[in-house]
Amino acid sequence: MYCSSSMHPNANKENISTSDVQESFVRITRSRAKKAMGRGVSIPPTKPSFKQQKRRAVLKDVSNTSADIIYSELRKGGNIKANRKCLKEPKKAAKEGANSAMDILVDMHTEKSKLAEDLSKIRMAEAQDVSLSNFKDEEITEQQEDGSGVMELLQVVDIDSNVEDPQCCSLYAADIYDNIHVAELQQRPLANYMELVQRDIDPDMRKILIDWLVEVSDDYKLVPDTLYLTVNLIDRFLSNSYIERQRLQLLGVSCMLIASKYEELSAPGVEEFCFITANTYTRPEVLSMEIQILNFVHFRLSVPTTKTFLRRFIKAAQASYKVPFIELEYLANYLAELTLVEYSFLRFLPSLIAASAVFLARWTLDQTDHPWNPTLQHYTRYEVAELKNTVLAMEDLQLNTSGCTLAATREKYNQPKFKSVAKLTSPKRVTSLFSR
């Protein structure tokens, strides 16, 4: 069904031939215009017959301007939302463009001046810090000089003056030994655990065990620190844990296993410690006891022993000799190790035992001069009167007044490599020094 053109007034417009439409898009030259006028065809208008929208203005680069405006407002504490009005109203922004540009320049100048002021303040603060640190360094230097002056006045030799050797820890030695003196009070075993805790063992059993461990440590060429730590672990464990006599040797080898792992470069294996007990204890038993000991001491193996203090005290004693006196070191170590087997020496602090060993060793080697001097008193922190009981008890061990038959320590220090210092005794008793 077809509709008439009268019913659709725009039908003629819709049914325009494609040729006419295409001709409207052909370029109009002068010759084509004459031909078209001759045929009665109207030339297409140069301007559109319908109303067009107003041409938009050319886009301008406003990104920097808007960013500078927002940044400056932010620095002033303004609101970004308020600045969006400037972006929505280009006419007003165009009118005030010059003013905003001037404001931006002013803000930039202000910010530069603020930055310069802040930089100057920072530099002044740094200069003050440098001057303060220099003042502190000078104050510390003055204190050190004052301290050295006091030591010279007291005739104390500075054994920490060798700052070139990093192993000496000269700068920290005093602080280190301050902490060690505190630690020996906190981690010492009970002096009467045989009476309070143990019921199946006695001091003689402990003496036999430790004398045997001295022999084991010498056979395996273990360092003295291993032996001292072994005895320390034994006493700490026995101070709070009951043990039967059948397991006392198991405790000893397990403690030496732990100490060897902690102190030695190459520790003996578990099988070695089982072997030295004639396989009385199996590997699982030794490992089980090792775990029990470590849990009991909470894995605190870094403890001050007599050997810890003995190194420093011997160094202080050697300061009075032009050439190091090797017999003094061997003899002091011998006297200190004699105390390991004696349960009664638990009542003395390790530092006191070390100081007494140096005192008695110096007296044994030379009776013409008093064994104590300001340097030893300064570094050991003990006066002569405080050493009396320990030195007298140690002299009894040296002379073996009790007739003890356990001689592992004596045989060890009778060897030529230790200058046979176990044979040395003093012709004069040390009691004469305390009666003055």
From Swiss-Prot:
Expressed in roots, stems, leaves, flowers and siliques. The keyword Protease does not apply. CDD domains: CYCLIN_AtCycA-like_rpt2 (cd20506), CYCLIN_AtCycA_like_rpt1 (cd20562). One of its GO terms (biological process) is cell division. Keywords: Cell cycle, Cell division, Cyclin. InterPro entries: Cyclin, Cyclin-like_dom, Cyclin-like_sf, Cyclin_A/B-like, Cyclin_C-dom, Cyclin_N, Cyclins_cyclin-box. GO terms for molecular function: cyclin-dependent protein serine/threonine kinase regulator activity. Belongs to the cyclin family. Cyclin AB subfamily. This is Cyclin-A2-2. It comes from Arabidopsis thaliana (Mouse-ear cress). The gene is CYCA2-2.
